[in-house]
Amino acid sequence: RPTMLQDPKWMEYTIHDSDGYYSAPLKFALEPDENGCVTLTLSGVNEPVALDSLTLTACHTNPSYEEYLERLKNSGASLEEGKDVVQIEGENTVNTSTNVVYPVEDRSDALTSPIDTSRTMLNTIGTEKWETAGQWIRYRFSVNSSGMYEIYSRFKQSYLDGMYVCRTLKIYTNGYESEDAYKAAFGNTAGYYDGVPFEEATQLRFDYNNAWQVKGLSKGGNKDETYPLYFEEGVTYTLHFEVALGSMSELVRQIESILNSLNDDYLSIIKLTGSSPDDYRDYSFTRLLPNTMLDMLEQSVALGQVSDFLKKDTVGVASSYTGICDKLQTLLEKMGRDENAIAKNLDNFKSYVGSFGTFLTDSKTQPLQIDYFRIQGASVKKPKAKANFFRAIGHEVSSFVMSFFRDYNSMGSMDTGETTKESINVW
């Protein structure tokens, strides 16, 4: 794998929630003191950083996609379909936010680009390396024809069973310091971008499937609406894709709240019963722990809401995560209504809460594997996600035959220009 180097540079950053629970920039209510001043204190936690300036601005809201289209119409630019087709290989990033995000090999499908059965090719990027809120990758491109373009991605999201992951798209126009400078050059501002183009781009959705998929920029839902964008001929653009919880953030907050309540309920119970309760003893839970009994019923209802959300608003089917919610919901309702069932089911309660905690951890991650992005007009045929039967068979046969000729001893070696004259003995 090629060596990744740090590229220190000045960057503008708007303060966000580092856990990704809130996708919008954080807002602060500031009140000046008697001297009309506001004091801000920054405390270092880890890693060195240089600050040039801090800027306080009024709260900004992103326009909707409909408002974005209206701005394009009012700008005077032609909104005809673009004629160019640009394919950006996922592994060919300009920058990544961390050296953990790097190209990886995939030979599972003949349509993965590029593909070579005789060699190891780092032909995709992402997987579980690109899953933490705030991690980003960047690409640069330009088109040879001004107009509206769809952005398709070939991706695989086979990591979160029955759930989807989200990404935030930001676009930057390179070479123009301001919108006015761009307008002076082109006579309109249609192709100028400086961040999130519209609100829907903050929660682009990639659904679960074991196979490769091809999809345009979409927020998901029943309509699965895509969002064509305007690009100007000859202008260099930067695409910035960032991991975000998106519409999953509210669900994650609810899951964490439920888990905290259930942990408190469990501690309340074992304070009375000990870690190994007697199944035949009357602990008088209703009299001694009425709030705990009530809370278990309340959390049972909340778990039902989580399960319904996963079944209806994700991929529409049950999964291992909905199974955890359904089992825990049934158990909580049983324990909350019948105090005699608490001691008998305490071990199951502990086990289910542990599994639910794993669910919370998984929900915070957003793994995604990218093969390529393709920028093309709406009338151009959509790229295929999977190879047909004959091409797939040919790929598998070729992979099998070439496995006898691959030099596995040289895999991973790189010529850096350095030579070693001495050898060492390893024992």
Where are the predicted features?
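Extracytoplasmic
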Residues: 1-395
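A short, compositionally biased domain-edge/stem linker segment
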Residues: 71-81, 400-417
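Short, well-ordered beta-strand elements
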Residues: 414-427
